[in-house]
């Protein structure tokens, strides 16, 4: 008598692991000659743009750029802005095979000091957070034949990353300030946001379409023809489409793509009526493939004593696309020192998914205002909000989310209250895990037979009892019990008398 066993490989995921590193940020901003002197610093912020995680030789590298923005008041009472861009990078030791890796970068405490009228020193840190899932290859039983072997066969759908692809390109466009606007002077603040609106997978190619949104808050040049002082807010939307080479990718695969927009480079045209905009964009595409895994979760022999070894395995079984646009309406009460509003905007932070699957939105609500004498002021407050997501109620093992502002507008009421309406986009993927037991080894003792079976057994099964347990107890197949008793479900829906013949 022979026992024929067939095994298959399956990549199991370990417990999600998180690694952290503090990266110092130290820089000095020396004001260019055409910038006015510093009298008072109003606002300073560090913003980051991260690159995709790079895996190489047992290390996972988190990198990107951090931009330190400083808004200040000049000796003439003007609202001015300057910034310093610097790269960052940190490599984490991650031995073993990594199933998935994603990073986030959080801004820590930043200190700012005007050393003199022309120099601003900044000292602080950012925190790089790496989230990984280790992959472990296991051999599990897929089928067994001979020697009276009876298998409880199950099937699970698994999702694995078929490939990650990166393509960098640069968008260079001209933005018109519009009719009646005075000549451009200088930038107070600017921002960029990239959104992929369409993503298609074809054989060995990924096709993306979307748009890049640029916002610029600016003031006119001092001797402009228009007497308006500003500031003015100009918004530009540039459509983009790019194709990414992706060898080995199938049309049936699922793709999650995003445009990572760096900090824009903006300069005025000679006549000050247009802006020359240059921005670096990174397309990051992650492709997922679904597979069906058949395995044996339990077995026994109708003829011989058998020994079965089972292990608990965890797999990524679902990749849930997350694309949620949340309309946020907030009121900003003006402090007594403020009389008029210059600008109100929202700066979203890294979104999270809580244990219950809900999305957690954190943001800073920011406002430039003026006091009764026309001097610039700055205020901000934090926003925290939970919203529904497609991943609610799921066992989330891992997620990759990004955020940006789709649309935004503000108004200033007579009662001394600023109101802001923002459409916040949360985009990315949440990965769900499934844990189950599978047979990893089995053997039979051909010297020990199970003995003769009774001709017939009447068994009274309780509600909720599993037919497999009954079949294993009496060493008959589950299929024969279902056929003999005209049953269609493995779990008894009520107390039932079962004939085992």
Locations of the language-model features?
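Membrane-lipid interaction segments
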Residues: 2-446, 450-453
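Generic beta-strand/beta-sheet core signal
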Residues: 362-366, 484, 501
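Primarily a LysM-type cell-wall glycan-binding module
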Residues: 445-483, 488-500
């Amino acid at each position: 008598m022979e026992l024929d066993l067939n095994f298959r490989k399956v990549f199991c995921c370990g417990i999600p692991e998180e690694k952290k590193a503090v990266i110092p940020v130290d820089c000095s901003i020396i004001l260019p000659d055409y910038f006015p002197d510093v009298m008072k610093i109003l606002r300073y912020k560090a913003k980051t743009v991260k690159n995709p995680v790079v895996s190489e030789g047992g290390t996972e590298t988190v990198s990107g750029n951090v931009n330190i923005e400083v808004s200040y008041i000049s000796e003439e009472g003007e609202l001015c802005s300057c910034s310093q861009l610097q790269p960052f990078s940190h490599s984490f030791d991650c031995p073993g095979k990594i199933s998935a890796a994603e990073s986030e970068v959080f801004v820590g405490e930043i200190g700012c000091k005007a050393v003199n009228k022309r120099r601003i020193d900044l000292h602080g840190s950012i925190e790089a957070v790496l989230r990984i899932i280790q992959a472990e290859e296991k051999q599990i039983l897929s089928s067994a034949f001979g020697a009276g072997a009876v298998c409880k066969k199950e099937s699970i759908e698994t999702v694995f990353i078929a490939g990650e692809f990166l393509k960098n390109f640069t968008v260079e466009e001209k933005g018109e300030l519009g009719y009646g606007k005075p000549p451009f002077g200088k930038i107070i603040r600017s921002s960029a946001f990239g959104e992929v609106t369409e993503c298609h997978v074809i054989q060995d190619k990924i096709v993306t379409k979307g748009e890049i949104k640029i916002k610029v808050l600016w003031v006119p040049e001092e001797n402009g023809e228009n007497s308006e002082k500003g500031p003015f807010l100009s918004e530009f939307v540039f459509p983009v489409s790019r194709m990414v080479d992706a060898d080995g990718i199938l049309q049936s695969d699922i793709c999650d793509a995003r445009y990572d927009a760096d900090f824009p480079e903006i300069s005025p045209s000679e006549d000050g009526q247009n802006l020359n905009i240059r921005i670096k964009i990174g397309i990051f595409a992650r492709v997922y493939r679904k597979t069906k895994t058949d395995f044996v979760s339990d077995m026994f022999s109708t003829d011989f004593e058998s020994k079965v070894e089972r292990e608990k395995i965890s797999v990524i079984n679902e990749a849930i696309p997350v694309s949620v646009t949340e309309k946020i309406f907030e009121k900003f009460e003006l402090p007594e020192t403020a009389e008029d509003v210059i600008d109100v905007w929202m700066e979203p932070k890294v979104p999270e998914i809580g244990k219950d699957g809900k999305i957690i939105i954190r943001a800073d609500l920011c406002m430039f205002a003026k006091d009764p004498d026309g001097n610039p002021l700055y205020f901000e407050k934090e926003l925290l909000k939970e919203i529904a997501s497609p991943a609610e109620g799921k066992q989330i093992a891992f997620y990759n989310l990004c955020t940006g502002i789709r649309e935004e507008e503000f108004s200033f009421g007579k009662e001394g209250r600023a109101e802001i309406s923002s459409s916040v986009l949360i985009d990315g993927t949440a990965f769900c895990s499934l844990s189950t037991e599978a047979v990893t080894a089995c053997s039979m003792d051909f010297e020990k037979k199970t003995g003769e079976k009774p001709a017939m057994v009447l068994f009274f099964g309780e509600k909720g009892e599993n037919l497999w347990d009954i079949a294993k107890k009496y060493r008959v197949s589950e299929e024969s019990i279902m056929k003999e008793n005209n049953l269609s479900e493995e779990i008894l829906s009520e107390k039932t008398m079962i004939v085992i013949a």
